[in-house]
Amino acid sequence: LQDLEWLGLSFDEGLAEGGSRGPYRQSDRSDLYESALVYLNQQGLLYPCYCSRKEIAAVAPHAQDEGFVYPGTCRPLNGIPLDLEHIRTKAFNGRYPALRFNTQAFRFPAYWHANTPSKDHRVMSYHDLIYGHQTAHLDKAVGDFVLQRKDGVYAYQLACAVDDYLFNSAYVVRGADLITSTHRQRMILAALELPLNQIPQYAHVGLVVDHSGERLAKRNQSIQLKGLRETGVQPHTLRASLSRILGGPDSDDIDQMANAFSWSKYSLTSGSNL
């Protein structure tokens, strides 16, 4: 947040600014995630999973950049509500369970599927503002994903889906390596039976890479905004450079950049099927 503030980006509301939709740390929003989890459980969409990552990797097909599609080892034959308080404390061979979303038991709300192009109820689709029409088969490409980890932490997919809705987000913009996550998060929102007109639009942008084609990442000790700031780079210089690289105006003025912005400039529209 300090880096973004240095770059000149401000927020309508947030951790520093405050606002009506707080708290703004996910660690302070557990009650909201638990409420969503309880609702999904009432529909029989959760089950405990005792598998380790090593066991899953040994038998599961690979799902793009986001790990493995769970093979359903612990999935029950029928989706029924769990006694969450009991199941969370029930160890098996010394392991406590994660809670997974039961994709097999999931059915789209009728109003949701009536507004999507696909007639196959095992296929999820949405329009990405950059990559065009996206589809994924729920069983083959999405699978049963974790909603709560075995250590009790609410998983990324659940937290992001709930936050994006409750913050009334109009757009979710993130890296193209998270396209599969969007299918999962939209599935959560559909299972929560939320109105389609209150679901965000999604845009996945290409990743920033170095000269060798490797994406910039902390683990690779790649350049960071903090490093540029500490070496004396001026924020207006960086803003102007980024604007030119992205085909914007030759200016460091954020309002000018925003006024010149259009999704159509970056649309690839090729679509993909998973």
What are these regions (language model features)?
Residues L1-D65, A176-L196:
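N-terminal Rossmann-like or analogous alpha/beta NTP/dinucleotide-binding catalytic cores
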Residues Q2, S35, A58, P76, ...:
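Charged/polar, solvent-exposed surface patches and flexible loops
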Residues L7, H86-F92, Y96, F106, ...:
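Non-catalytic terminal extensions that flank enzyme cores
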Residues G8-E17, Y165, A203, K218:
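A short alpha-helix capping/helix-coil boundary motif
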Residues F11-A16, L196-Y202, P249-I254:
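Short, surface-exposed acidic
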Residues E13-S30, C49-H62, L84-R100, V233-P249:
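Hydrophobic transmembrane alpha-helix bundles
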Residues S30, R53, G67, P71, ...:
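Alpha-helix initiation and N-capping motif
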Residues P48, K54-L216, Q224-R229:
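Active-site cores that bind ATP or allylic diphosphates and position pyrophosphate for catalysis
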